[in-house]
Structures are given as C-alpha cells and as structure tokens.
C-alpha cells in the first residue's frame, strides 16, 4: 500500500491516466454515448454528474471493461485497453450494492482479489491489514458483512478495491444507499482517503451536492454528451448553459432584452421591465434576447412600501426557515416566482419578512451570469 501513497505526481504531471477518444456506444439501436472525448488526470477526483439515463454509468463501465465501446479508443496509463478484458485492466470498481461476499469474513473479502491474482501468501495478510487500517476497520477483520453497518460495508468495499493497487478507482453511485448523515460523513472520508492514496478516483452520481463537495473536477453529462467540464466552483458559478445552471442547485432565470453596450464588459438591459446594468462581454446587439441567471443566495431583498416602485419588485408569498438561512419566494408582478436565500440573523429586524410584504430585489453587480438564446438549452 506504501507504493500507492508514494506515487510521484511530478513525473506524471501533464499526462492523463485515462484518455477516452471518440467513444460511442449504442444499445438496441439507440445511441447512449456519442463521440465522447475525455482526459482524466493522475491523482484527480473526477465526478461524472448527470440525470438518470445520461450515459454516466455507461462511461464508467466502458472504462472498467464491463462494456465494449462501439467506436473510439480507451487508453489507460499509455496502454490501449479498448479491447482488453476487465480482469486485465488496472482498474477497480466499487458498486452501489458493495457486492461483498456474505459467507466470507471481512479479511477474506478484502483478500479475494489478491488471491485471484495469485499474490504470494506472505504478502496477503500485511496488504489486507494495511488496507483495513486505511479505512479504520482493522478490528473488524474477522466479522461477516451482515455484522457491519452500511457505512462500514462501504469502507470494506473500498478497502477491497484499493488493496490491489489500481491505477484508477471507479465508484458507481456508491454512497446512494446510505442515509443522509452517514452519506455526508462518507463524503469527507472518501475525499481524505483519495488524498491519502494519491490515486485517481472517478465517481458517478446524480447528486449535485455530493459532486460539489468531493470533486477536484466535474463533468456534467446529458444524453451521452458532455455539457460542461470544470471545477466545482466553475460549474456552480459559471454554468455554460441553462441545463447546467438548473441541474446544479437552485437558480433564478430572468428574461432580459439588451438595450445598449456600455463598455467592453457591461451592457444595459431590460430585466422584468426595469433597466439594469449587467456584465456580458460576448457579442450582442440591441434587441437580443438574453437570460440573466442568479442563485438564491446572490439576491438581496429590501422591504418597501406599497406605494414605492424601486427596481424589480414583488411580494413575499412563502417563507421557509432552515436554521442558517431564511428562504423566501417572491412573486413579481409578471407572475415570475423568485427564490431568495438569506443568512438568518435573529438580531436583524428586517430579515424575517412578512407574507404579503412588498419587496425590491437587488444583487451585487457582476454576480450575475448572462446567457444568450443559443445557450438556452
């Protein structure tokens, strides 16, 4: 296990551990993956995120060798493995069901892969115990899987996968069977383990919060195509289109019309009947239809009198107290419902808005993301 921990990242820098080139895959005549290209770097925690049926698990299964690509090439650590069977790829998979052998002890479950590889008997025990120490379950070595909690079973499945010293560890929605509190705990532990091992993790999930909290990099997929590739912050704060924006967290989408360009970075636009200045450095003409995107936490609401008209206005129709935040729904005169999330401060007399209260909606200039009609989907 020490070999894994001492991977020389400098030697491998700049060279992907996995390269998918022009990959396509169809089932029963329906294309699931179309001309997909993806590089995965050494020591990276990459998450493939997308709705059910987007092709993310198919990509994982093709990397593992459980599915064969119809077209394209899969390269693993400079070796073309497109036609190499799963058992000869230096890749291990942790499944959603964990797939532990119920009749075997924890020790034997973890040792199974080593024995299948005909590892010398003298090496097996120290390697298994080292793997169990990494997941803090060395004292459970002689127990059976049914004697363990869900979180412990998950850690055993990971220990069984990493004991073989894979170049890449694949995780297929492997936290989804856990309850919320345990899932949050395992997210932290999984990221810590990945840093400790220094090997590449490729994690598949449909849970946006999970992806944002664990990943170095996120691939957002839809219908077999990569919609966006970037860091968690880029994906959340700079979505490339409305699909990504709406899939990753809550977002408000205001329809806007460009009026004029102010300078290289800013334009004047009409948003909900109100002239506003927004940041948009791409080409646009007066009259172009745009969308202005703002997260609920980026918006501010100011209580105003019924007689006042102050920018974009509406009335509070819902309030939800969530401990740290107070979430409000504001209905504009146009009928649009706007979500606003404010940090709750019990000493602030203005934060707990009354239902029916008239409010003005504002935000810090440049916090918005502006898309044109071509980026709508």
From Swiss-Prot:
One Gene Ontology MF term: ATP hydrolysis activity
Quaternary data: The complex is composed of two ATP-binding proteins (PotA), two transmembrane proteins (PotB and PotC) and a solute-binding protein (PotD).
Localization per record: Cell inner membrane
Domain of life of the source: Bacteria
Membrane-related topology note: Peripheral membrane protein
Protein name: Spermidine/putrescine import ATP-binding protein PotA
Protein's UniProt keywords contain Cell membrane: yes
Gene Ontology, cellular component aspect: ATP-binding cassette (ABC) transporter complex
Domain spans labelled ABC transporter: 18-248
UniProt source species: Vibrio parahaemolyticus serotype O3:K6 (strain RIMD 2210633)
Catalytic activity: ATP + H2O + polyamine-[polyamine-binding protein]Side 1 = ADP + phosphate + polyamineSide 2 + [polyamine-binding protein]Side 1
Keyword Cytoplasm: no
Family: Belongs to the ABC transporter superfamily. Spermidine/putrescine importer (TC 3.A.1.11.1) family.
Chain residues that bind ATP: 50-57
InterPro entries: AAA+_ATPase, ABC_SmlMolc_Importer, ABC_transporter-like_ATP-bd, ABC_transporter-like_CS, Mo/tungstate-bd_C_term_dom, P-loop_NTPase, PotA-like, PotA_ATP-bd
EC category name: translocase
Pfam annotation, one family: ABC_tran
UniProt keywords, alphabetically: ATP-binding, Cell inner membrane, Cell membrane, Membrane, Nucleotide-binding, Translocase, Transport
Function: Part of the ABC transporter complex PotABCD involved in spermidine/putrescine import. Responsible for energy coupling to the transport system.
EC number(s) stated in the UniProt entry for this protein: 7.6.2.11
């Amino acid at each position: 296990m020490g070999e894994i921990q001492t991977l020389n990242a400098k030697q491998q820098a700049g060279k992907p551990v996995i390269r998918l080139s022009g990959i396509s895959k169809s089932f029963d005549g329906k294309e699931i993956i179309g001309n997909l290209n993806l590089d995965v770097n050494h020591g990276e925690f990459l998450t493939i995120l997308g709705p059910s049926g987007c092709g993310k698990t198919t990509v994982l299964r093709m990397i593992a060798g459980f599915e064969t690509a119809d077209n394209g090439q899969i390269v693993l650590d400079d070796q073309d493995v497109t036609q190499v069977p799963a058992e000869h790829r230096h890749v291990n998979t942790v499944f959603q069901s964990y797939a532990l052998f119920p009749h075997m002890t924890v020790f034997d479950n973890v040792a199974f892969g080593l024995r299948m590889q005909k590892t010398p008997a003298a090496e097996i025990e120290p390697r298994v115990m080292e793997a169990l120490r990494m997941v803090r379950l060395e004292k459970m070595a002689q127990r059976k899987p049914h004697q363990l909690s869900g979180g412990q079973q998950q850690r055993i499945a990971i220990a069984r996968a990493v004991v073989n010293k894979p170049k890449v560890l694949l995780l297929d929605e492997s936290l989804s069977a856990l309850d919320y509190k345990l899932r949050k705990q395992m997210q932290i532990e999984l990221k810590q383990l990945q840093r400790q091992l220094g090997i590449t993790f490729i994690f598949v999930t449909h849970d946006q919060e999970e992806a944002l909290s664990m990943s170095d990099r996120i691939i957002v997929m839809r219908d077999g195509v990569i919609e966006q590739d970037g860091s968690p912050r880029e994906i959340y704060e700079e979505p490339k289109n409305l699909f990504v924006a709406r899939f990753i967290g809550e977002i408000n989408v205001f329809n806007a019309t460009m009026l004029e360009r102010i300078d290289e970075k800013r334009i004047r636009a009409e948003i909900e009947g109100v002239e506003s200045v927004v940041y948009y450095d791409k080409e646009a003409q007066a009259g172009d239809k745009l969308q202005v995107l703002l997260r609920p936490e980026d918006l501010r609401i100011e209580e105003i009198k019924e007689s006042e008209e102050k920018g974009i206005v509406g009335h509070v129709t819902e309030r939800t107290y969530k401990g740290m935040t107070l979430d409000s729904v504001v209905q504009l005169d146009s009928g649009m419902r706007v979500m606003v999330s404010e940090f709750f401060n019990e000493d602030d007399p203005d934060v707990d808005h009354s239902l029916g209260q008239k409010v003005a909606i504002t935000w810090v200039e440049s916090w918005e993301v502006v898309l044109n009609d071509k980026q709508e989907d």
